[in-house]
């Protein structure tokens, strides 16, 4: 297993990171990290080459970081450069950025 978690602070202080919320559309529309795009887990898993380029870095999150860690590790094994945002949306809600 590849451990590739990264802190929320680190990502949100970057210049134009590509942040992907892998939660379902309904949950995303209830609230999400500022600047995040929504690609639900099963859409991303089923068609990752349609959404991602191997030339970019992606920062993924879900509700608590578990599901995004799983898919991030899987995508990395396919040659993509992805990182899991540690703690997911729950961490964002208690952060200074919310």
Show the residue positions of the predicted features.
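Rhodanese-like catalytic fold shared by cysteine-dependent sulfurtransferases
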Residues: 1-10, 14-17, 24-57, 63-98
